[in-house]
From Swiss-Prot:
Endpoints of the signal sequence: 1-5
Electron transport is among the record's keywords: no
InterPro entries: GnRH, Gonadoliberin, Gonadoliberin_I_precursor
Modification Pyrrolidone carboxylic acid, positions: 6
Positions bearing the site annotation: Cleavage: 8-13, 15-16
Cellular localisation: Secreted
Functional description taken from the UniProt entry: Stimulates the secretion of gonadotropins; it stimulates the secretion of both luteinizing and follicle-stimulating hormones.
Name listed for the protein in its UniProt record: Progonadoliberin-1
GO biological process, alphabetically ordered: regulation of signaling
Principal place of residence: secreted
Origin species: Macaca mulatta
Transmembrane segments: none
Amino acid sequence: EGCSSQHWSYGLRPGGKRDAENLMDSFQEIVKEVGQLAETQHFECTMHQPRSPLQDLKGALESLIEE
């Protein structure tokens, strides 16, 4: 017999269903965490770098929250 597991994070419930009441909170938490990661990357390197994929992800999540 195989073993299965469920990853629980950001409001996920067993079976992959999301808790609709907490979905916006989850998105806002993700945006905050991505922003913190992007800030860390910004300060660690003094060389000019192209736009970070994390910044793009943050922008996409923020636009979803605004809709």
